[in-house]
Amino acid sequence: MPTHKKIIQDLTKEELAEKIKPAFRSKQIYDWIYHKYAASFEEMKNLPKAMREELDAEYTLAPLKTVTVQDSMDGSRKYLFELHDGHTVEAVLLLMRDKEYHEDGSVKHQERYTVCISSQVGCKVGCAFCLTAKGGFMRNLTAGEIVEQLRMIKKDNDIAANRRVNIVFMGMGEPLDNLEAVAKSVKIFAEEEGMAIAPHRQTISTSGLSSKIEKLGKMELGVNLAISLHAVDDELRQQLMPINKAYNIESIITAVKNFPVNDRKRVMFEYLVIKDVNDDISAAKKLLSLLDGIKAKVNLIYFNPYGGTEFKRPSEADMKKFQEYLTKRGLHCTIRESKGLDISAACGQLREQELEGEI
């Protein structure tokens, strides 16, 4: 799918308005892109034909091509997208079902969508437990390529423009290693005349690039921060996550303490639980001490096995013991329900696919 055209989704609303005159035309284009999910400029019939032709000559509306869609029994959907240069990335649509309990005893069921998107082709971090790392790093995604993942998923699932959607930058790649493009995509997602996904519905997950955490904080984007911690001492963390050699636990904790968090929010610490590696109560004790004084919540994640790994999934009993130790001592802690296991769409299972022979 070769192209040398610019990606129009790389432009913010303001940047598009600077290039397209008069102003109402840029608003029409923005509406076609993010509300009507246009696949081509030719569809934009309320634009003059000459303008449609000029746009088509300079820009593409289709920087990604859907290669495969896999459906999970739990309602999740995994997308494999091909980029213009032949590389591929994956994104996942998660259907979350919440229950609201009312005083009269009634229960209201609500469905909401969370989309897990990628920020890079591959990843440099090289975590021992992550399948994405096995393929190495290829390149960063542009803001438009990040944005297009969500746009295509919303269109494919007929998700209304005003439907509540949460975004998690937890797909392929280290988001803070591509901070400028990720930050720009956050702003594009939040545009009120576009997708209107407020920053507090967007979560950026990082392996702990402390200097970039500080930079992200200074940007004042208003996004949620999630730290992929996974170990409570530097020795084990460096075995699991080689990047710990450059960004150790102490530097991460310092950066988190300086990160701006509003009164109703907490920094999420993600802790991937691996059987007989980091799942005992002594680790829970150290974690409690480590997060003392931080507005934190802990998200325990089951390790999701894949072919060739030596790591094992922990038992449900051990997960609950770990959780109970923390919650009884005042630390907010949840166990993440694994989604998309049957289609390899769960945490740590995304990777770039070779288009011949693997799909």
Swiss-Prot record:
Cofactor comment text:
Binds 1 [4Fe-4S] cluster. The cluster is coordinated with 3 cysteines and an exchangeable S-adenosyl-L-methionine.
What is the name of the protein in this document? Dual-specificity RNA methyltransferase RlmN
Gene of origin?
A: rlmN
The entry marks the following residues as binding S-adenosyl-L-methionine, namely: 173-174, 205, 228-230, 304
InterPro entries assigned to the protein according to its UniProt record, in alphabetical order: Aldolase_TIM (IPR013785), Elp3/MiaA/NifB-like_rSAM (IPR006638), Methyltransferase_A (IPR040072), RlmN_N (IPR048641), RNA_MTrfase_RlmN (IPR027492), rRNA_lsu_MTrfase_RlmN/Cfr (IPR004383), rSAM (IPR007197)
GO CC term, one of those recorded:
cytoplasm
Q: What is its main location?
A: cytoplasm
Q: Which reaction equation describes what this protein catalyses?
A: adenosine(2503) in 23S rRNA + 2 reduced [2Fe-2S]-[ferredoxin] + 2 S-adenosyl-L-methionine = 2-methyladenosine(2503) in 23S rRNA + 5'-deoxyadenosine + L-methionine + 2 oxidized [2Fe-2S]-[ferredoxin] + S-adenosyl-L-homocysteine; adenosine(37) in tRNA + 2 reduced [2Fe-2S]-[ferredoxin] + 2 S-adenosyl-L-methionine = 2-methyladenosine(37) in tRNA + 5'-deoxyadenosine + L-methionine + 2 oxidized [2Fe-2S]-[ferredoxin] + S-adenosyl-L-homocysteine
* Miscellaneous note of the record: Reaction proceeds by a ping-pong mechanism involving intermediate methylation of a conserved cysteine residue.
Location comes to: Cytoplasm
List the disulfide bonds in this chain. Answer: 116-347
Kindly list the cofactors needed.
[4Fe-4S] cluster
State its role: Specifically methylates position 2 of adenine 2503 in 23S rRNA and position 2 of adenine 37 in tRNAs. m2A2503 modification seems to play a crucial role in the proofreading step occurring at the peptidyl transferase center and thus would serve to optimize ribosomal fidelity.
- Report the EC code(s) recorded for this entry: 2.1.1.192
Q: Name one Pfam family in it.
A: RlmN_N
Q: Does this entry carry the keyword Oxidoreductase?
A: no
Alphabetical list of CDD domains matching this protein? Radical_SAM (cd01335)
- Active site (UniProt): 90 (proton acceptor), 347 (s-methylcysteine intermediate)
